[in-house]
């Protein structure tokens, strides 16, 4: 069985009857959603908030009941993947382009469980490019200010056209030559730049990590 599938399906066991659940986006969260769809079919009663249009479509296909985050005060649990995770449970997310909604849903949850395969576990964040969501207006000026923090940037494309997020924004992917020694500081500095909507750094948000390894499940 695929390591992502092992982690994703195991995470679904943390979802209990009556919970309000945030559904993540990406290839690992896909397996959690598939498993939850199966459990709903077997009688599990939950309400879910998707973190992307892609996840919304999958949940609808599996008949998982969906609600709007506007209609609830908080969620019991969100299960989502990550592009990188360190031993302090700090993350880089946004490889799939859903980082803003993912962060809104995660910050509205009492608990955030991150599911990854062992290849995503790193000593220091920053080998994977850091996604930053920016507004399209004057994006080159915003990109230039981001570059002034010492990174190389690439405007994200899809099918040779500018990638547009579910919120009609753009994404700049950033490589920092010396990785990211202090993610919380970098996040704050990036958020001070006018035009930056959100960063893919998730700091002090994760309750638990479930890692699919060749030797089985590991929890952090």
Swiss-Prot record:
Annotated residues for binding of substrate:
25-28, 80-83, 93-96, 120
Entry-linked InterPro entries: NagB/RpiA_transferase-like, Ribose-5P_isomerase, Ribose5P_isomerase_typA_subgr, Ribose5P_isomerase_type_A
Active site as annotated? 102 (proton acceptor)
Q: Which GO biological-process labels does this protein carry?
A: pentose-phosphate shunt, non-oxidative branch
Q: What the protein does? A: Catalyzes the reversible conversion of ribose-5-phosphate to ribulose 5-phosphate.
| Sequence similarity | Belongs to the ribose 5-phosphate isomerase family.
Please name the PANTHER family in this protein's record.
RIBOSE-5-PHOSPHATE ISOMERASE 3, CHLOROPLASTIC-RELATED
What's the protein here called? Ribose-5-phosphate isomerase A
UniProt lineage:
Bacteria, Bacillati, Bacillota, Bacilli, Bacillales
Per the record, the gene is rpiA
């Amino acid at each position: 069985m695929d390591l992502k599938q092992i982690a994703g399906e195991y995470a679904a066991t943390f979802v209990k009857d009556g919970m309000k659940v945030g559904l993540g986006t990406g290839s690992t969260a896909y397996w959690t959603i598939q498993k939850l769809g199966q459990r709903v079919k077997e009688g599990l009663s939950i309400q879910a908030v998707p973190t992307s249009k892609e996840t919304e479509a999958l949940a609808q296909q599996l008949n998982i009941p969906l609600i709007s985050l506007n209609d609830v005060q908080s969620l019991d649990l969100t299960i989502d993947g990550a592009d990188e995770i360190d031993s302090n449970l700090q993350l880089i997310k946004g490889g799939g382009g859903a980082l803003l909604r993912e962060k809104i849903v995660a910050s509205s949850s009492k608990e955030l469980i991150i599911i990854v395969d062992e290849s995503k576990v790193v000593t220091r964040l920053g080998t994977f490019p850091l996604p930053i969501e920016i507004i399209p207006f004057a994006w080159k000026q915003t990109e230039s200010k981001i570059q002034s923090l010492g990174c190389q940037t690439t405007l994200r494309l899809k099918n040779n056209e500018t990638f547009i997020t579910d919120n009609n924004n753009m994404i700049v992917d950033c490589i920092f030559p010396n990785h990211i020694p202090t993610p919380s500081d970098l996040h704050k500095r990036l958020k001070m730049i006018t035009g930056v909507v959100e960063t893919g750094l998730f700091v002090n948000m994760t309750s638990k990590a479930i890692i699919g390894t060749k030797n089985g499940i590991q929890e952090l």
